[in-house]
UniProtKB/Swiss-Prot annotation:
Assigned keywords, A-Z: ATP-binding, Chaperone, Cytoplasm, Nucleotide-binding, Stress response
CDD domains registered for this protein in UniProt: HATPase_Hsp90-like
Region listing for A, in residue ranges: 1-329
Gene, per the UniProt record: htpG
One GO location term (cellular component): cytoplasm
Compartments, record wording: Cytoplasm
Protein name per its UniProtKB record: Chaperone protein HtpG
Keyword Translocase (UniProt): no
PANTHER family (alphabetical): HEAT SHOCK PROTEIN 90 FAMILY MEMBER (PTHR11528)
Assembly and interaction partners: Homodimer.
GO molecular function terms noted in the UniProt entry: ATP binding; ATP hydrolysis activity; ATP-dependent protein folding chaperone; unfolded protein binding
Family label: Belongs to the heat shock protein 90 family.
Taxonomic lineage of the native organism: Bacteria, Pseudomonadati, Bacteroidota, Bacteroidia, Bacteroidales
Length: 684
């Protein structure tokens, strides 16, 4: 006889809450319902193995079907089923799961019971206007019953016509969720969430191309692999098995570099396979490729909190029943087990890298460029991993040779130790753009390493803290003599007037760009040194590079690029510029410079008159004279600058020297480059 009742919940509002907020993604309902069906099937296997069920188990599978016309999705199993009393106990009492009780009773059995989250069944109401449960227990003399509920706390329970044991969950999909009535949608979700469940999941028939269209065959379409690679013993797997499994997970990805097979049962349960992909120079594109499973049930691909952040760059599968989940299984909660699991995975990754480095260094070096970003990220974010990685991290020099920390220090400390005892590591970030700077260093007997990766600016700063008496300097950050200071700088023999004149002449021809700032500087580099070159200060450039990845450093990223235009005051060409100015311009500047000298002398007298007086005690006439003096000085300086600027604009040698320096630093482009070529042809 039919029976009506009220579901045992504390509030009439529980169903709207379930419908909207139980899970972040409504599609999770399919995983929950199919997982429950797998649970019921696993229970039957367990009961059979312990002799509590002696009947024929038959073909144990879970079948999923969609009826677009009837607007239903049905999930059927041939598991233990339920009696009327069990329906009352397990379905009508929200937050109590039969799997929880079953686990307690058979806790020593190996059967995997995944439905221990309490509310899983009720996820069906997120997409359904009504849910029917037709079920028949495996027990002898059991009769079938049908439970129906429309999403309110009221339900009906009545006898049903069902010949076999097991359960059919029939979800009547509401208008709002019609997308789930598309077979392609359901097949995609089954592939995502149920790909490795332990019981065969059948969804329709396999199809083939026939008579100009796709048609069903007689073969069942099994969605899942019930024995995926990570559940097997490593000894039973060949390299090709691991690669084939990787291709099944990531069909569009390149072949992995190598992998780690995880298999731990104490003090926590953890299995899985982690693959090292070829990591490109972009961290964000690589994330969220590790899939988390709980007893072969897909949970999420967002594993932050389970593994250290740098390990999210790996690919593969982690399966553990010891990772706590909230009611939705979508968000992870931190606990002691998670920390142990995280530490274990980090250790296994470091072990694997060190093993390859020690046993097959040529292969390790060959794959280093694809590993480097991953290793650097780990060193920057995980202290324990840094300690391990310090043994196998590799520097690469400009010729492609690779060295460990100790090897490289031994190589360079003899010639690259400065006067203060610091070992200076020279590096370039652009092999071609910084070629001239690299060549100068090489000619001096220095080694230059290539650090052109996304994280290299951060690694450089970290290593300066970690490595004793070590300083990293980019090869274009200063003149060659100053990169590794062996002695005090040579004195620049220019008068103040000559310095000021050269500054004005070269500033007049420097490019006008809001994003670039140039400062004219002077060095005594010898007559054989370059006449002019461009350097970029190490600190500011490094801060700008680091700002690209650290929002908190955005201030540096917004500053213009700052360069030094270094004039070699010993070079004949610089002397020629200065001599030309003295011959062509200085005669017309004699009176102006004399006037400047007079004005400065007058200014000094006025300042003397103000000494010891409060502002209100200074005569008005003195204040006015001081203001007039400043105006006259500015006017006279302006006249001098105008003449120097005009001379510089017409002087092809100055323009040529500046453009050569810009060209050597990769800063000469577009119209400026075209003009340089035209001018060079004229000069030739």
């Amino acid at each position: 006889m039919s029976k009506k009742g009220t579901i045992g919940v504390t509030s009439d509002n529980i169903f709207p809450v379930i419908k909207k907020f139980l899970y972040s993604d409504h599609e999770i309902f399919l995983r929950e319902i199919v997982s429950n069906a797998v649970d019921a099937t696993q229970k039957l296997k367990t009961l059979t193995s312990v002799g509590e069920f002696k009947g024929e188990t038959g073909d144990l599978r879970v079948t999923v079907s969609v009826d677009e016309v009837a607007r239903t999705i049905t999930v059927s199993d041939r598991g233990v089923g339920m009696t009327e009393e069990e329906v009352e106990k397990y379905i009508n009492q929200i937050a109590f799961s039969s799997a929880e009780e079953f686990l307690e009773k058979y806790k020593d059995d190996k059967a995997a019971i995944i439905g221990h989250f309490g509310l899983g069944f009720y996820s069906a109401f997120m997409v359904s206007e009504r849910v029917d449960v037709i079920t028949r227990s495996f027990r002898e003399d059991a009769t079938a019953v049908k439970w129906s509920c429309d999403g309110s706390p009221e339900y009906t329970l009545e006898p049903a016509d069902k010949a076999d044991r097991g359960t059919d969950i029939v979800m009547h999909i509401d208008e709002e969720n019609s997308e789930f009535l598309k077979k392609e949608k359901i097949e995609g979700l089954l592939g995502k969430y149920c790909k490795f469940l332990t019981v065969p999941i059948i969804f329709g028939k396999k199809q083939e191309w026939k008579d100009g269209k796709m048609q069903d065959t007689d073969e069942d379409n099994q969605i899942n692999d019930t024995h995926p690679a990570w559940t097997k013993k490593p000894a039973d797997l060949k390299d090709e098995d691991y690669k084939e499994f990787y291709r099944s997970l990531y069909p569009m990805s390149e072949e992995p570099l190598f992998w780690i097979h995880l298999n731990v049962d104490y003090p926590f349960n953890l299995t899985g396979i982690l693959y090292f992909p070829k990591i490109k120079n972009n961290l964000d594109l690589q994330r969220n490729k590790i899939q988390l499973y709980c007893n072969q049930v897909y949970v999420t691909d967002e594993v932050q909190g389970i593994v250290p952040d740098f390990l999210t760059l790996l690919h593969g599968v982690i399966d553990s029943p010891d990772i706590p989940l909230n009611v939705s299984r979508s968000y992870l909660q931190s606990d002691a087990n998670v920390k142990k699991i995280s530490s274990h995975i980090t250790k296994k990754v470091a072990d694997r890298l060190e093993e390859i480095f020690k046993n097959d260094r040529p292969t390790f070096e060959e794959k280093w460029d694809s590993l480097k970003l991953f290793v650097e990220y780990g060193m920057l974010t995980d202290e324990k991993f840094y300690e391990r990685a310090a043994k196998f991290f590799l520097f690469t020099d400009m010729d492609g040779h690779k060295y460990t920390f100790d090897e490289y220090r031994t190589l360079v400390e003899g010639v690259q130790t400065d006067k203060d005892g610091q070992v200076v590591y020279l590096y370039a970030t652009d092999k071609h753009g910084q070629y001239s700077h690299v060549k100068r260093a090489s000619d001096k007997g220095y080694s230059v390493m290539l650090l052109d990766g996304q994280l290299d600016p951060h690694i450089v700063s970290l290593l300066e803290q970690k490595l004793e008496k070590t300083h990293f300097v980019r090869v274009d950050s200063d003149t060659i003599n100053n990169l590794i200071r062996k002695e005090e700088r040579a004195e620049v023999k220019l008068s103040d007037t000559e310095r000021a004149t050269l500054v004005k002449l070269f500033e007049a021809r420097l490019p006008r760009d809001e994003k670039k700032h140039f400062n004219v500087a002077f060095e005594s580099l010898g007559a054989e040194g370059e006449a002019i070159l461009i350097t970029q200060a190490e600190f500011m450039r490094r801060m700008r590079d680091m700002a690209q990845l650290q929002p908190g450093m955005s201030f540096y990223g917004e500053l213009p690029d700052s360069y030094n235009l270094v004039l070699n005051t010993d070079h004949p060409l610089i002397d020629r510029v200065l001599s030309g100015e003295k011959e062509s311009v200085e005669p017309s500047l004699t009176e102006l410079r004399a006037k400047i000298a007079e004005l400065k002398a007058e200014e000094a007298k006025l300042l003397d008159e103000e000494k010891g007086k409060k502002p209100e005690e200074i005569p008005v006439a003195t204040k006015e004279a001081k203001e007039n003096n400043a105006v006259e000085q500015a006017k006279t300086e302006g006249s001098i600058n105008d003449q120097l600027t005009k001379y510089a604009q017409d002087n092809e040698l100055i323009g040529q020297l500046i453009d050569l320096a810009l060209l050597g630093s990769g800063l000469l482009t577009g119209e400026a480059l075209a003009e340089f070529i035209r001018r060079s042809q004229r000069l030739l």
